[in-house]
């Protein structure tokens, strides 16, 4: 009863993110909750006075173009990160597909969070002594995702997809290419995995939402200075499998 919510869906389009955020700023809302990296970037660019809480954002320093990072943005932006347990996901790839000769990493080149995860997965595989060739397969958007996925499926023994908004929106398309080709897909989070993967080690997004909501209450009630609020993460991690694809 104390809060009015204005929920808008950008439908995966960056231009829509900008339009929605600009409308919020013109209305002088009390807080902007930005779900995903593109929305957070639009909000951070549009206002330096309205508190902005991000959620489902993987890499805050990259999203906000910050050269130094200690967990606190130091401005009107904070929130929660959905950064996956990448070291453990690298271990999962090697455990499930131990004889892989080529591991493909499929992601959208326009998403800095995906680039960040890719770098860590590659270094983690190297540290674990992985002998497979690790190759990146990047698409720029929905127009070329099918062609790039087809190339990856033709060359790889296993494909890894990080937490990637474009891939999540096109998971069915990816599955329609990889499953007939017999190429297993291991994913960075549960939503993508349900659409096209065999397994993931994922955070609990419900818990992430709860944490973000608690931060919003603290900001709105004046109990916290957002410029001093550290970005938080979900604590629970769980393994998820899709049995019908694992067969």
Language model features with spans:
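Beta-alpha junction/loop-to-helix N-cap segments that form part of ligand/metal-binding clefts
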Residues: 6-66, 164-188
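An alpha-beta-alpha
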Residues: 78-128, 225, 229-244
């Amino acid at each position: 009863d104390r809060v009015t919510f204005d929920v808008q869906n950008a439908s995966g389009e960056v231009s829509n993110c900008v339009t929605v955020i600009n409308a919020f700023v013109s209305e002088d809302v009390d807080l902007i909750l930005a779900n995903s990296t593109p929305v957070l970037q639009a909000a951070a660019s549009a206002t330096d006075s309205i508190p902005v809480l991000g959620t489902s954002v993987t890499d805050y320093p990259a999203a906000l173009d910050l050269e130094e990072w200690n967990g606190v943005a130091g401005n009107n932006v904070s929130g929660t990160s959905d950064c996956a347990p990448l070291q453990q996901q690298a271990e999962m790839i090697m455990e499930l597909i131990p004889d892989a000769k080529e591991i493909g990493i499929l992601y959208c080149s326009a998403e800095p969070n995906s680039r960040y995860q890719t770098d860590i997965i590659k270094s983690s595989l190297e540290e674990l002594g992985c002998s497979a060739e690790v190759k990146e397969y990047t698409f720029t958007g929905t127009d070329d995702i099918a062609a790039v996925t087809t190339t990856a499926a033709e060359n790889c023994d296993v494909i890894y997809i990080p937490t990637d908004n474009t891939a999540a929106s096109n998971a069915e398309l990816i599955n329609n290419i990889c499953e007939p080709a017999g190429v297993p897909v291991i994913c960075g989070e549960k939503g993508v995995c349900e659409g096209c993967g065999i397994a993931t080690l994922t955070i609990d997004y419900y818990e992430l939402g709860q944490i973000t909501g608690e931060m919003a209450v603290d900001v709105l009630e004046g109990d916290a200075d957002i410029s001093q609020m550290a970005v938080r993460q979900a604590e629970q991690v769980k393994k998820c499998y899709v049995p019908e694809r694992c067969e």
